Amino acid sequence: MEETYNPKTVEETAQRIWEESGVFRAREDSGREKFYCLSMFPYPSGRLHMGHVRNYTIGDVIARYQRMRGKNVLQPMGWDAFGLPAENAAMQNGVTPAAWTDANADYMRKQLKSLGLAVDWDREIATCKPEYYRWEQWLFTRLFEKGLIYKKTAPVNWDPVDQTVLANEQVIDGRGWRSGALVEKRDIPMYFMRITAYAEELLAELDDLPGWPEQVKTMQRNWIGKSHGCEVHFPYEDGSDVLKVYTTRPDTLMGATYVAVAAEHPLALEAARDNPELAAFIEECRHGGTAEADLATMEKKGMATGRFVVHPLNGEKLPVWIANYVLWGYGEGAVMAVPAHDERDFEFANKYGLPIKTVIVSTVGAYETVDTKGGWIDAYAEHGRCTNSGKYDGLAFQQAFDAIAADLEAKGLGQKRTQFRLRDWGISRQRYWGCPIPIIHCLSCGDVPVPAEQLPVVLPEDVTIDVGSPLKKMPEWYSTTCPKCGGAAERETDTMDTFVESSWYYARYTCPDNTEAMLDRRADYWLPVDQYVGGIEHAILHLLYARFFHKLMRDAGLVHCDEPFTNLLTQGMVVAPTFYREEGGKKHYFGPTEVELSTDERGRPLGATLKSDGAPVTVGHIEKMSKSKNNGVDPEALIDRYGADTVRLFTMFAAPPDQSLEWSDSGVEGAFRFLKRLWTRAAFSVNTAFSQYGRDELRVTDWALVPLAPNHKEARRMIHATLKQANFDFVRHQFNTVVSAAMKILNTLADDKGFWNCDHLPEGDEKDAFRRSAAVVAFEGYSLLTRLLYPIAPHICDALWRQLMPGTDILDAGWPEVDEAALAQDEIELVVQVNGKLRGKITVPADASRETVEQIALADAQVLRFVEGKPPKRVIVVPGKLVNVVA
């Protein structure tokens, strides 16, 4: 066996063997327990970053571990290939989005393979391929016919730079998530998926996901936002209609002093017809986003409409205002304003001099009435007892809720109602690089779904990309005939939100070669996904949409389980220091390879200089690796220098998977040193100790029959004790402590002074017996160690196994099992205390009786010293732990 570790040779050899044998190709086998392990598929941006490496290594470690546990494992890979970056790249580089995407996927596939992932590449999919999105279009037409997809004109978030609609979740602080442009509100006809029809189920079945992080489930619960409240009707002053509002605080109804409506509300539009100033304000409001998150930060603005409504219980006239903090499309697009007990209303009322009436005295707030001239305090919004509310005075929250709801219902002016914050999913995008919406517009027949036999509606690839969608400028593509009447018609030129593709890809992996159906019975074998791995940033967008889409497929008879992902692991970020200089009021960031960093003895940064000029640079915060902060590390360069196993080992050892991983060059060096040492020590054993015996002699089947030297027996006990803890840690995905266990085992096997040293023995049978004892324990130790470490560093472990067990495959060996008999100890060490203070330790037989333990303790020199000849009052023995002598 080669004595020097050469990662390039080792990894190329292992990957070639895996590729040629097809060992990771998954096949359905009803006689075996399946395990479907999936990491969120990447967008083919061109190059892997360390976030990718960590994500896919975590998934691969789990997949390989489950494979060694004997399960039938599926771990596929593909490309989330539609999206705006491809269009932007096409404009910048003069290539088509399809060519750019394919080239990037080809390059990233090579990078992923260099990591040694146990992926079934035969199942690779790309969402931009017609054979994939054909079935998305097919399901769209079925859902459209059922009314679960519908078209309506609605106010949307319009990104003026990308010229497309954004979902509420894609608006961050009032700006588009990709372009960063301030969003506008526009009324656009678009298609919606009726996710609200599944709101109750999506909420309730979160309780059926114990394998999900509680944080993710809480985020989804809050986003779905189920609330119990009242619908309240405020009659128009002239009695012509009623203004409907929804409130979760009917107990504050008597404190309503005005009503606020959204700029798009019919009452607002009617009032603006003969009021140019009001019309201008409505237009201004259209430049705000439609996401609730914006409301907390935007300046509250409003304008009186000159219209009034009547309070349903006390008959007071309340003015109607247009307010920019009221969203059209959420609830009724109108709110009853109770400034004394709602922070937004309080701010608005103070700004515009509107009345503020206290109607609740909080049980936790020390106030009798709201201080209208002071600032807002949170206690104003707390539940309490009604005051200044007529017959409702003194009622607690629920009592007032029920009484007011009953009175409203009796008057025909309201009722109790349950409402969800969740809104239907607008999926139309005015972009080119996406799945075409399979609808044909006919002047006679209306919107007609494309018949199944005409699917897929293929996206043309020879296009010129500029602002907006080129499809609208291609009559040769959109001009067609109506499937119903045969008359002239036009195709829909909008494409689907790319989150639609990522909402069902996990299911298509089970049968990617099926050209006759979206899914087949193979999906029943593999689904649900047993372990899903991805970032918590997808908690609402992707994970909620995927759960919804899964239920759509279930109700269409395509899948037969309720949830797509049984267990979810949300990995932490990869973070690293930042380095910059202030130039012209802006920070110019430098990459880690551009600076010389000085550190203290613990590796903490002390300062940094720029290599090019030797002048200092500022060491900034430790932040997520990103292009904008220029603090990323190139995985490809690391793999070229150290090998994939070193990169994998470091990313698993540096932090638990669900926590942030702080990058450390010295940590990578340390991981490389460990693998070199593992190889060197294993080679030493194979070339020397093991070479003296046949493999059958080294493989022990009954350890009770093998005489072991005392130190080897103790070493074996430690190895199995460490393995037992590592097994527990693997199940909990604490891979960092698994690596620690591997290091501990190697330290035992590499102990030349203790484990291998037999210089004190004379030549002859005794020394030969010692050497054989060392060899069989070391052979078992390396056998256990290579299998324990295999999921994390598979290439080196595969190579070492072939040296340990020529002609066999480490995957066939299975996961190492703990020998409980090896854990038994002849003697144990106990702590000895005198009057509760530590005074020493004693060694006793493992099976010693309580009386024997007491005798040994009382005879101990340290105990005799501290009891000073006094007879003990009592002796407390805690089995296996300590003895406390009370003198």
Swiss-Prot record:
Record keywords: Aminoacyl-tRNA synthetase, ATP-binding, Cytoplasm, Ligase, Nucleotide-binding, Protein biosynthesis
Pfam families: Anticodon_1, tRNA-synt_1, tRNA-synt_1_2, tRNA-synt_1g
Motif 'KMSKS' region mapped to chain: 624-628
One GO process term, biological-process aspect: leucyl-tRNA aminoacylation
Short motif 'HIGH' region, span: 42-52
Binding site for ATP: K627
Gene Ontology, cellular component aspect: cytosol
Matching InterPro entries: aa-tRNA-synth_I_CS, aa-tRNA-synth_Ia, Leu-tRNA-ligase, Leu_tRNA-synth_edit, M/V/L/I-tRNA-synth_anticd-bd, Methionyl/Leucyl_tRNA_Synth, Rossmann-like_a/b/a_fold, tRNAsynth_Ia_anticodon-bd
Single annotated GO MF: aminoacyl-tRNA deacylase activity
Catalytic activity: tRNA(Leu) + L-leucine + ATP = L-leucyl-tRNA(Leu) + AMP + diphosphate
EC number(s) from the headed UniProt entry: 6.1.1.4
Localization per Swiss-Prot or TrEMBL: Cytoplasm
Matches recorded under SUPFAM superfamilies: Anticodon-binding domain of a subclass of class I aminoacyl-tRNA synthetases, Nucleotidylyl transferase, ValRS/IleRS/LeuRS editing domain
PROSITE patterns cross-referenced by the UniProt entry: AA_TRNA_LIGASE_I (PS00178)
PANTHER family: LEUCINE--TRNA LIGASE, MITOCHONDRIAL, LEUCYL-TRNA SYNTHETASE
Family stated for the protein in its record: Belongs to the class-I aminoacyl-tRNA synthetase family.
Full protein name: Leucine--tRNA ligase
Source organism of this protein record: Methylococcus capsulatus (strain ATCC 33009 / NCIMB 11132 / Bath)
Organism lineage string: Bacteria, Pseudomonadati, Pseudomonadota, Gammaproteobacteria, Methylococcales
Name of the coding gene: leuS
